[in-house]
């Protein structure tokens, strides 16, 4: 079951998107996310401030 779920996830990525992610088309392979610019300390504070 787990293998099938992993395969379904891979099917949703197009070949051009995969090339971009892996850096095969001259890209860096980096996908910028909301956490890309954030400091680890900021995330640690968010997840530990109320515990």
From Swiss-Prot:
Disulfide bonds: none
(Z)-2,3-didehydrobutyrine PTM positions: 48
Processing after translation: Maturation of lantibiotics involves the enzymatic conversion of Thr, and Ser into dehydrated AA and the formation of thioether bonds with cysteine. This is followed by membrane translocation and cleavage of the modified precursor.
GO CC annotations, alphabetized: extracellular region
Transmembrane annotation, as ranges: none
InterPro entries noted in UniProt: Lantibiotic_typ-A_Lactobact
Keywords from the named record: Antibiotic, Antimicrobial, Bacteriocin, Lantibiotic, Thioether bond
Protein purpose: Lanthionine-containing peptide antibiotic (lantibiotic) active on Gram-positive bacteria. The bactericidal activity of lantibiotics is based on depolarization of energized bacterial cytoplasmic membranes, initiated by the formation of aqueous transmembrane pores. Lacticin 481 is a broad spectrum bacteriocin exhibiting activity against a wide range of lactic acid bacteria and C.tyrobutyricum.
Assembly and oligomerization: Monomer or homodimer.
Name this polypeptide is given: Lantibiotic lacticin-481
Species name: Lactococcus lactis subsp. lactis
